[in-house]
Amino acid sequence: MAGHSKWANIKHRKGAQDAKRGKIFTRLIKEITVSARMGGGDAATNPRLRSAITAARAQNLPKDTMDKAIKRGTGELEGVNYEEVRFEGYGPGGVAIIVDCLTDNNNRTVADVRHIFNKYGGNMGTHGCVAFMFDKKGQIMFDAEGINEDAIIEAALEAGAEDVVHEGDSFEVLTDPNDFSDVLEALATAGFATPSEAEVVMRPQNLQQLDEQQASTMLKLYEKLEENEDVQNIYANFDISDEIMETLSA
């Protein structure tokens, strides 16, 4: 069942950098708040909130912080009213990009995201123009060091996962979105309790290989989107060879 997912590995490394900047906590808090606002504060009856809490626990977000985020969503505490916005478009080399945002000022966010696309060789498209190139999946990432491949594959499949992908220094466990929380909990029970990342994502069906120039520009576009305070998640279907990544990292 093991395969390869270069994009997941790139995203995994970038996710580690993101965590160091602390943005990931802000992103998780906003998702919990919006989930509670849309579906209520009971995770047992609100699947989106349950997934958000599961992802937050995987990143060690304090329980008190989660509880306050839920209360802001249900109106028990005062908070910002965020609107969900999804942008779709293309980057260098025809890369398909989805950008999910939570914003308190839609006009500002539209202008900011469009500016980033235009500045770094991309262009915004219409709703639905690239979403069909992605599948919604639960994604649980583990650092590969110290993990037996056969053991994690067996545990994941027994837990109800769809696939396990080994790429570089990480394992990626894929699930149906509805099974995400159950699989994560079952993996923890089986001894795999410390994922580096766990969330429901839009996973590309195929990857677009980029040359060095395209890769350089695409990574700049990605990083600028990532730095925007309204951006929650970025999904893209690009692939960069190890050789080009080494050159760009030098």
From Swiss-Prot:
GO molecular function, one term: DNA binding
Entries under Gene3D superfamilies matching the protein: 1.10.10.200, 3.30.70.980
Matches recorded under InterPro entries: Integrase-like_N, TACO1_YebC-like_2nd/3rd_dom, TACO1_YebC_N, Transcrip_reg_TACO1-like, Transcrip_reg_TACO1-like_dom3, YebC-like
Residues that span the membrane, as ranges: none
Keyword Transcription part of the UniProt annotation: yes
Pfam families, A to Z: TACO1_YebC_N, Transcrip_reg
GO cellular component terms, A-Z: cytosol
Keywords: Cytoplasm, DNA-binding, Transcription, Transcription regulation
Taxonomic superkingdom: Bacteria
GO biological process, one term: regulation of DNA-templated transcription
Compartment(s): Cytoplasm
Family: Belongs to the TACO1 family.
Alphabetized PANTHER family for the sequence: TRANSCRIPTIONAL REGULATORY PROTEIN YEBC-RELATED (PTHR12532:SF6), TRANSLATIONAL ACTIVATOR OF CYTOCHROME C OXIDASE 1 (PTHR12532)
Name this polypeptide is given: Probable transcriptional regulatory protein Mmc1_0479
Organism classification: Bacteria, Pseudomonadati, Pseudomonadota, Alphaproteobacteria, Magnetococcales
